[in-house]
UniProtKB/Swiss-Prot annotation:
This is Peptidyl-prolyl cis-trans isomerase A. The gene is Ppia. The keyword Methyltransferase does not apply. It comes from the Eukaryota. Its EC number is 5.2.1.8. The modification Phosphoserine is found at S77.
Length: 164
C-alpha cells in the first residue's frame, strides 16, 4: 500500500505563496490519515479548502484546520465532532512533521499543525500522522507571517487542496 499524498496551495492575503505536499502515514495511523485526506479533498461536503492558518509561531509550528469558526475553537472530523487518539507510534522529530491539534486526550477534530522545529514535548500527547514531502520552503515563508503569540500579520489561506 502506498501512503496517500495531499497538497495545499497557500496564499498570503490572496497572493500565492506556493504548494505544500504532505505524505500521510496511513500505514501507521490509518484513521487519522483518512480524516486529513478526506478533509483535503472535501469529498464529504466539508473540509480545508478556503480555511486559514489561524496560529503561526515562528520556530515552533503553523496551525490550521478550523474550517467552522476560523479561530481555533472549531472544526470537525469526518467521523463526527471528535475522535480518539489512534496511537503515538510516530514522534515529533523535526521540521515538517504533521500532527493533530487537540484540546486534551481523544479530542481530535480537523485542526492540525505543521512543525517547524523538533517538538518532542508533544510526543504522546498529539498524534503524528504525516510529513511535508515537498514545499518546506513554503512553510518557512508562512512562518514569517507569524508572531510569538501566534497572530498572523497576513491571512494565510489554503486556497485549494486535494489528493495527488
Amino acid at each position: 500500500m502506498v501512503n496517500p499524498t495531499v497538497f495545499f496551495d497557500i496564499t498570503a492575503d490572496g497572493e500565492p505563496l506556493g504548494r505544500v505536499c504532505f505524505e500521510l502515514f496511513a500505514d501507521k495511523v490509518p484513521k487519522t490519515a483518512e480524516n486529513f485526506r478526506a478533509l483535503s479533498t472535501g469529498e464529504k461536503g466539508f473540509g480545508y479548502k478556503g480555511s486559514s492558518f489561524h496560529r503561526i509561531i515562528p520556530g515552533f509550528m503553523c496551525q490550521g484546520g478550523d474550517f467552522t469558526r476560523h479561530n481555533g475553537t472549531g472544526g470537525k472530523s469526518i467521523y463526527g465532532e471528535k475522535f480518539e487518539d489512534e496511537n503515538f507510534i510516530l514522534k515529533h522529530t523535526g521540521p515538517g512533521i504533521l500532527s493533530m491539534a487537540n484540546a486534551g486526550p481523544n479530542t481530535n477534530g480537523s485542526q492540525f499543525f505543521i512543525c517547524t522545529a523538533k517538538t518532542e514535548w508533544l510526543d504522546g500527547k498529539h498524534v503524528v500522522f504525516g510529513k511535508v514531502k515537498e514545499g518546506m520552503s513554503i512553510v518557512e515563508a508562512m512562518e514569517r507571517f507569524g508572531s510569538r503569540n501566534g497572530k498572523t500579520s497576513k491571512k494565510i489561506t489554503i486556497s485549494d487542496c486535494g489528493q495527488l
